[in-house]
């Protein structure tokens, strides 16, 4: 039994209302893991072979997630529903690098390499999964959440990236 089915069962047994939010990668000042690695790489100005990637990625800024949770807690129509949630602006990996560079106030250094070549080299180096995440698509349509609950994210993708980049640059200055 999946986690959603368990929650629905608990709701049926107890009468407790539930709301399930499915979310993509969250970015936030203080971010770590792969997103931090991408910030570091873009900030160093290294040329990246990511130009022309035609994937589609959804992201969610932590401020938008917090606001959406407040909306869910206050809105009676949210009860016992499942919603997909994102910033609402899907981007390719290439576009994400460009937006991060803009937030860092540096030029994006992208060049094109055939995707097959990158995948082959990644396979030899044992990095296929990491490259698959860079090239793959993962997007969520949050239109139902917006329509049902009248939600408008308080932060655009660029605003969230600006706040995250500002944190990153301050952390470099402050050690």
Task: Briefly describe each language-model feature range.
Residues 71-129, 158, 162-165, 172-175:
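Mid/C-terminal beta-alpha module of Rossmann-like enzyme folds, strongest
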Residues 39-50, 106, 142-143:
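A short C-terminal helix-loop "cap" of Rossmann-like NAD(P)-dependent dehydrogenase/epimerase domains
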Residues 28, 50-55, 83-90, 99-105, ...:
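Glycine-rich Rossmann NAD(P)(H)-binding loop
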Residues 20, 59, 90, 139, ...:
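Short aromatic/basic micro-patch
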Residues 62, 95-98, 121-152, 163:
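Conserved C-terminal active-site "lid" loop/helix of NAD(P)H-dependent oxidoreductases
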Residues 1-19:
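Active-site Tyr-X1-5-Lys
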Residues 2, 31-37, 51-74, 80-84:
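Substrate-positioning beta->alpha
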Residues 16-37:
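Flexible, glycine-rich beta-alpha linker
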């Amino acid at each position: 039994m999946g986690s959603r089915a368990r929650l629905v069962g608990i709701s049926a047994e107890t009468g407790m209302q539930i709301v399930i939010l499915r979310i993509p990668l969250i970015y936030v000042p203080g971010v770590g893991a792969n997103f931090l690695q991408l910030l570091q790489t873009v900030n160093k100005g290294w040329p990246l072979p990511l130009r022309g990637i035609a994937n589609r990625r959804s992201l969610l800024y932590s401020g938008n997630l917090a606001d959406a949770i407040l909306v869910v807690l206050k809105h009676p129509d949210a009860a016992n529903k499942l919603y997909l949630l994102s910033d609402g602006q899907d981007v390719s990996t290439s576009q994400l690098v460009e937006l991060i560079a803009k937030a860092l106030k540096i030029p994006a250094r992208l060049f094109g390499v055939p995707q097959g070549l990158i995948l082959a080299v990644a396979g030899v180096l044992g990095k296929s999964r990491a490259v698959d995440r860079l090239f793959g698509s993962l997007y969520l349509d949050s239109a139902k959440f917006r329509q049902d609950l009248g939600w408008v994210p308080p932060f655009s993708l660029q605003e969230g990236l600006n706040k995250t980049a500002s944190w990153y640059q301050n952390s470099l200055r402050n050690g």
